[in-house]
Regions:
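Function-determining surface determinants
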Residues: 1-236
Length: 236
């Protein structure tokens, strides 16, 4: 319902913020969630200890950059502008009469076709999961997230049990793909840290994450089969 041009400025602001938020988040996930089991398993591996110290330094630098971003006047303007955009509904200013008329339609008439369309996009991409590149898998995760949020917003319109089961399946798929995406991001973080391909520490890390990726690829296949057995709540 909201034209892209109506949200273009807001999207640009969020991209600016994410430029600082994204790297800080990536290093937090890597050091707080991904690496602790590896550090515990190899407590005496000197190369890993040295890498950990350097990684913490890099994380601290990204956190400082994020603090500077949040302290930038643009951040305060961003928050106020976004709040006004929602509260005052200024996003409606440029809508055509046809789009304005759609806002008055019953939400069920809008939600059901949207959910069905998004579901089909997810299924089309997910059926060929094994052939997808890492970028395409990330795109699938975004589609699943869109479908999950859309249904979560409209869940009260449909049978509760079916909606709960479907949302649970989507959440599991999203989490599994999220871990796989974090594993892919690891390569970029190792490059950023200057860890040489031939170094023992990098080989240990890549081997560890390679095993995690294989496990989650198998898990995704199981979760996908379960998702395929879920009834679509908007069809009940």
């Amino acid at each position: 319902l909201v034209p892209r041009e109506a949200s273009a400025e807001r999207v640009e602001d969020i991209r600016w913020l994410n430029g600082a938020l994204g790297p800080a988040r990536d290093w937090d996930v890597f050091l707080d969630e991904g690496m602790p089991p590896l550090f515990s398993h190899f407590p005496r591996k000197r190369g890993l200890a040295l890498f950990r110290a350097k990684a913490e330094t890099i994380r601290a630098a990204h956190r400082q950059a994020l603090q500077q971003t949040v302290g930038d006047p643009r951040y305060a303007v961003l928050l106020q502008a976004f709040t006004d955009w929602l509260d005052r509904r200024t996003w409606r200013d440029g809508l055509s009469e046809e789009r304005r008329a759609k806002l008055a339609e019953p939400v069920l008439d809008f939600a059901t076709p949207l959910l069905e369309h998004t579901h089909r996009r997810v299924v089309k991409r997910g059926e060929s999961f094994a052939e997808l590149s890492s970028e395409e898998r990330h795109g699938l995760r975004i589609r699943i997230k869109e479908l999950r949020y859309a249904l979560d917003f409209c869940a009260s319109l449909y049978p509760a049990a079916a909606a709960k089961s479907y949302l649970s399946a989507l959440s599991s798929l999203q989490d599994c793909l999220g871990v796989m995406n974090d594993i892919v991001v690891t390569q970029r973080l190792l490059d950023e840290a200057g860890l040489r391909t031939a170094s023992a520490a990098r080989q240990v890390i890549e081997g560890w994450y390679g095993c995690r990726l294989a496990v989650h690829e198998q898990l995704f296949a199981e979760l996908w089969r379960g998702f395929g057995q879920c009834s679509r709540p908007w069809q009940d």
